[in-house]
C-alpha cells in the first residue's frame, strides 16, 4: 500500500547519498566485460534489494522464503537473463543508499520515480500499478458516479495517512470521511453497515474478500479513482541493465504474463499499465 509517510523517510538520505555517488564513482568502475553485459555486481547473479514486509506484493512465506508479486516477476526476470537470483531483505530506508553503494544491482520495492530519487538512481519503466478504487457492500445499489457518492448522506472509510484518505477528501468532499489506523477496521466498517464505502487499493479488496465471503464489491466506475506506478531502481550509469529491465517489462506486459502474475499473487485484475 502507498503510505505518504513511507516514502518521505528516504528524502533525508538524499544529500548523503549524492555524496556517496561521487565517492563510489571515483573509487571503482563497473566491469563491461562481454561476459557481464548488464554490469552486475557479481557476474551471473542478479542481486536485488527488497523490503519483504508488504503482502501480497513482497513478503516472507510460512517457510521464511521470499514470495509475492515482485518475487514471482523477479524469478521470471532472472530466468530470462540466464542468471541466478539473490534477494537481500533490508529496511526500506537502507535500500537506495545500499544501491548507490553497490551492495546490490537493483531495488524492487514498488518505488515511485520521484524527482528526488531520480537525482541518485535510474528507474525502469513501471512494473506494478497501485489502483485506488471505491468498494461498497454487495447489496448496495448506489450508482457508480462521483455525484452519487459525493453526498452528505455517505460515509467513506480509508486507511489513516494513506493516499486513499486524501482521495476521499478530494474526490468526495461532501461525504463524511472516516479513516482508521488499521486497514481491516476500515473494511469492516463498510461490511457491517456502519459506513457506505471504502477507498482502497484493488488488490487489498481482493484479499479482504478471500476471508470475508465476498461481502464487498468494487463500484463499477469506468476507471480507477487514481493509479500510481512503481518502478525498479538501478545505479546511475548502468544503462545496459535499465534498458533490459524496461524491455523485459514490455515483453511480459504484451504477452500477458504480467497480468497472469498479478492475478496469481494479488488476486485481482491488473489495472491499466502505460503502453509500451
Residue ranges and their predicted role:
Residues 128-136, 206, 210-249, 268-276:
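Periplasmic-binding protein-like
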Residues 137-156:
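Flexible hinge/capping segments at coil-to-helix
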Residues 71-80, 140, 162, 229-269:
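Extended ligand-binding regions for polar small-molecule ligands
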Residues 28-36, 163-180, 217, 249-276:
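Ligand-binding clefts/hinges and TM-proximal coupling segments of bilobed small-molecule sensing domains
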Residues 31-110, 119, 264:
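Extracytoplasmic small-molecule ligand-binding "clamshell" domains
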Residues 93-94, 110-120, 169, 191, ...:
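A ligand-binding cleft/hinge motif common to bilobed small-molecule-binding domains
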Residues 1-43:
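Short, low-complexity disordered leader/linker segments with a strong preference
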Residues 58, 62, 74-83, 146, ...:
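Ligand-binding cleft/hinge of the Venus flytrap
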Amino acid at each position: 500500500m502507498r503510505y505518504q509517510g513511507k516514502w518521505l523517510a528516504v528524502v533525508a538520505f538524499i544529500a548523503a547519498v549524492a555524496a556517496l555517488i561521487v565517492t563510489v564513482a571515483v573509487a571503482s568502475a563497473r566491469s563491461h566485460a562481454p561476459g557481464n553485459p548488464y554490469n552486475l555486481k557479481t557476474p551471473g547473479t542478479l542481486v536485488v534489494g527488497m523490503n519483504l514486509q508488504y503482502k501480497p506484493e513482497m513478503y516472507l512465506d510460512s517457510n521464511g522464503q521470499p514470495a509475492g508479486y515482485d518475487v514471482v516477476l523477479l524469478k521470471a526476470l532472472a530466468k530470462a537473463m540466464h542468471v541466478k537470483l539473490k534477494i537481500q531483505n533490508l529496511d526500506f530506508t537502507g535500500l537506495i543508499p545500499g544501491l548507490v553503494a553497490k551492495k546490490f544491482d537493483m531495488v524492487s520495492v514498488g518505488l515511485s520515480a520521484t524527482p528526488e530519487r531520480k537525482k541518485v538512481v535510474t528507474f525502469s519503466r513501471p512494473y506494478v500499478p497501485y489502483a485506488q478504487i471505491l468498494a461498497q457492500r454487495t447489496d448496495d445499489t448506489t450508482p457508480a458516479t462521483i455525484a452519487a457518492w459525493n453526498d452528505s448522506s455517505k460515509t467513506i472509510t480509508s486507511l489513516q495517512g494513506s493516499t486513499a484518505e486524501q482521495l476521499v477528501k478530494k474526490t468526495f468532499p461532501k461525504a463524511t470521511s472516516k479513516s482508521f489506523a488499521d486497514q481491516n477496521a476500515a473494511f469492516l466498517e463498510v461490511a457491517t453497515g456502519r459506513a457506505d464505502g471504502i477507498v482502497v487499493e484493488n488488490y487489498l479488496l481482493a484479499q479482504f474478500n478471500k476471508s470475508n465471503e465476498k461481502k464487498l464489491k468494487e463500484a463499477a466506475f469506468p476507471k480507477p479513482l487514481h493509479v500510481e506506478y512503481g518502478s525498479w531502481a538501478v545505479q546511475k550509469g548502468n544503462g545496459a541493465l535499465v534498458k533490459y529491465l524496461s524491455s523485459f517489462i514490455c515483453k511480459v506486459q504484451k504477452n500477458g504474463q504480467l497480468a497472469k502474475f498479478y492475478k496469481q499473487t494479488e488476486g485481482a485484475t491488473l489495472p491499466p499499465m502505460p503502453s509500451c
